[in-house]
UniProtKB/Swiss-Prot annotation:
Name listed for the protein in its UniProt record: PF03932 family protein CutC
GO molecular function list: copper ion binding
Short name of any one Pfam family annotated for the protein: CutC
Summary of subunit composition and partner proteins: Homodimer.
Keyword terms of this UniProt record: Cytoplasm
Family per similarity comment: Belongs to the CutC family.
Transmembrane segments: none
Highest taxon in the source lineage: Bacteria
Localization per Swiss-Prot or TrEMBL: Cytoplasm
GO cellular component: cytoplasm
Organism the protein comes from: Shigella dysenteriae serotype 1 (strain Sd197)
Length: 248
């Protein structure tokens, strides 16, 4: 049966995902940045309360995946922390200036991760040559690759995802970016074994007082009175679709 991973940005969202049938959680911070490393406090609280597998993302900033020496040192430290806290896996990825996997740095990450399952995130979608990259990731011992098939969403990239799945000795290919209940059947019919979804929506802040003349963001148009939350009903709907597909 296909595995359902839900992207979560808080301990509460991880619990919602678990209660509604998620098989695994990718734990992140900063949804508007596409997911950054969660704080130590969030990591500890999730580790204590969530019982399904949780894989934290290790990404020190938004933007590209070519990191300075200082940023890479922080990545290694965060990998060690996640391992010490007892998480079963993590999500990360590093590219070089030419859009190839930075093999030297990824080897250091794999050594620091030890027995943890490592997912190479959507840095894969920014690489120059996906098939060569897939071979490199297999050589590194990467467990799975999260990809939209190098398109803006996974449905558009489904043909490339199918090509990657068919590639010999490839890691597990997990489809992600825009995967929802309404299009999930396309991925299941294509034989995708793992899907990744945010399964959520922006929720208004409970704050009644709002200082509309001041923003804490450099983006003047940012809505600072909303937060992204997992929709339990959406998770349950996706899980039900997967179970019904398996029963056919």
């Amino acid at each position: 049966m296909a595995l359902l991973e839900i992207c979560c940005y808080s301990m509460e969202c991880a619990l919602t995902a678990q209660q509604n049938g998620a098989d695994r959680v990718e734990l992140c911070a900063a949804p508007k940045e596409g997911g950054l490393t969660p704080s130590l406090g969030v990591l500890k609280s999730v580790r204590q309360r969530v019982t399904i597998p949780v894989h934290p993302i290790i990404r020190p900033r938004g933007g590209d995946f070519c990191y300075s020496d200082g940023e890479f040192a922080a990545i290694l430290e965060d990998v060690r922390t996640v391992r010490e806290l007892g998480f079963p896996g993590l999500v990360t990825g590093v590219l070089d200036v030419d859009g190839n996997v930075d093999m030297s740095r990824m080897e250091k990450i794999m050594a620091a991760a030890g027995p943890l399952a490592v997912t190479f995130h959507r840095a894969f979608d920014m690489c120059a040559n996906p098939l060569n990259t897939l071979n490199n990731l297999a050589e590194l011992g990467i467990t799975r690759v999260l990809t939209s098939g190098q398109k803006s969403d996974a449905l558009q990239g489904l043909s490339k995802i199918m090509e990657l799945i068919a590639h010999r000795d490839a890691p597990i290919i997990m489809a992600g970016a825009g995967v929802r209940a309404e299009n999930l059947h396309h991925f299941l019919a294509a034989g995708v074994l793992e899907v990744h979804s945010s399964a959520g929506a922006w929720q208004a802040s409970p704050m009644r007082y709002r200082n509309q003349g001041l923003s804490m963001s450099s983006d003047a148009h940012a809505d600072e009175y909303s937060r992204y939350v997992v929709d339990g009903a959406a998770v349950a709907e996706m899980k039900g679709i997967i179970e019904r597909h398996q029963a056919k």
